[in-house]
């Protein structure tokens, strides 16, 4: 005897087929399909209706446009500031209103001063208007405001490289999550202590569903662990886990383009699957080195044992600013510093 299919099941199957038919088998998202534009060495990629990524200025820059104006995440290297400003002006004729820095590295904060001066503050007056000097500082003397984790301000103000007009005008401390509402979008900033460095911030545009990861994520090579500035391998893995927790995959319609997009500090745009693969790679290598340390192996012995085996071709160049050897050394020193 064969079971019959009732009308309820037929309706359910019909709804499922209709839903599948509504989505093509190939990506049609006009933004992802749009060809990047390049001018003055800056590549402009539209990733959402109101979100763009600028590449080629040192680190990736994100431009979020809305009724308030343009909100930037990072500003690139100082020497590329004029080209970056021109690229932003091709995207929008609104003023730069706010800048958020993901870290303190020169390729992310170098353009702060020029781009802030090209903008205009969101605040006509500061909350503590009774204190004239404090009021001017919070409104950045009419220029766009700059927000970052306090260690970014500490680094920039301790260096002769950066003019005071490029320092963060608001540095958040204490709580690891800071929230703002900009351009009709909820913006969350998560401080990730001791990851790439001790000054890393993840920026999440909730409505746009875009995350800016800064130097926590760089799919071109193994993560850079900046030991001198508070970076650790365990903090890096914790930060990658945070990224995974914040992202949403395209399930159940896995062939469609709808998903959380993650913009790294350098290189191509990623999604949750990319971050998971990257996190797993970093974790495997960390665990291999930790096991070798427990067995009493020296750094040179660990290098000869090749703990990055299976990943070097994709992530571990032998030459350049960040190599396989440098990564293994950083992981070893990070792990042995705890003991």
Name each model-derived stretch.
Residues 1-16, 25-29:
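Bacterial N-terminal signal peptides that target proteins for export
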Residues 34, 124, 131, 251-259, ...:
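Accessory terminal helices/loops
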Residues 42-90, 201-214:
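Conserved beta-strand hairpin/beta-sheet module of binuclear metal-dependent hydrolase folds
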Residues 44, 67-71, 78-131, 142-144:
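Active-site metal-binding motif and surrounding structural segment of the metallo-beta-lactamase
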Residues 46, 69-70, 75-79, 131-193, 197-198, 206-207, ...:
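Metallo-beta-lactamase
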Residues 50, 64, 74, 88, ...:
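Divalent metal-coordination and catalytic microenvironments
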Residues 58-61, 70, 77-80, 103-109, ...:
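Solvent-exposed loop/turn segments at secondary-structure junctions
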């Amino acid at each position: 005897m064969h079971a019959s299919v009732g009308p309820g099941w037929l309706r359910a199957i019909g709804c499922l087929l209709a839903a599948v038919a509504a989505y093509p088998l190939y990506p049609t998202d006009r933004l992802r399909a749009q060809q990047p534009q390049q001018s003055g060495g800056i590549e402009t990629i539209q990733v959402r209706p109101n979100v763009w990524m600028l590449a080629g200025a040192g680190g990736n820059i994100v431009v979020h446009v809305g009724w308030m104006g343009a909100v930037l995440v990072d500003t690139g290297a100082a020497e590329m500031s004029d080209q970056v400003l021109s690229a932003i002006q091709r995207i929008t004729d609104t003023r730069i209103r706010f800048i958020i820095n993901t870290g303190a590295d020169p390729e992310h904060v170098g353009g702060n001063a020029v781009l802030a001066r090209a903008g205009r503050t969101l605040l006509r007056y500061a909350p503590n208007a009774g204190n004239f000097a404090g009021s001017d500082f919070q409104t950045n003397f009419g220029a766009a405001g700059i927000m970052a984790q306090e260690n970014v301000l500490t680094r920039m103000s301790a260096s002769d490289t950066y003019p005071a007009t490029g320092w963060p005008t608001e540095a958040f401390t204490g709580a690891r999550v800071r929230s703002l509402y900009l351009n009709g979008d909820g913006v969350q900033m998560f401080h990730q202590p001791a990851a790439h460095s001790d000054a890393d911030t993840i920026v999440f545009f909730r409505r746009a569903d875009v995350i800016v990861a800064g130097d926590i994520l760089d799919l071109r090579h193994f993560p850079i662990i900046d030991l001198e500035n508070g970076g650790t391998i365990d903090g890096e893995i914790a930060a990658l886990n945070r990224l995974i927790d914040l992202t949403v995959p395209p399930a159940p319609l896995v062939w469609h383009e709808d998903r959380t997009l993650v913009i790294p500090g350098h290189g191509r745009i990623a999604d949750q699957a990319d971050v998971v693969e990257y996190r797993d790679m970093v974790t495997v290598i960390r665990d291999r080195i930790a096991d070798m340390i427990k067995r009493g192996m020296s750094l040179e012995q660990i290098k000869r044992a090749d703990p990055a085996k299976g990943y070097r071709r994709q992530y571990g160049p032998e030459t350049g600013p960040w190599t396989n050897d440098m990564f293994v050394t950083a992981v070893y020193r990070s792990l042995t510093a705890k003991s």
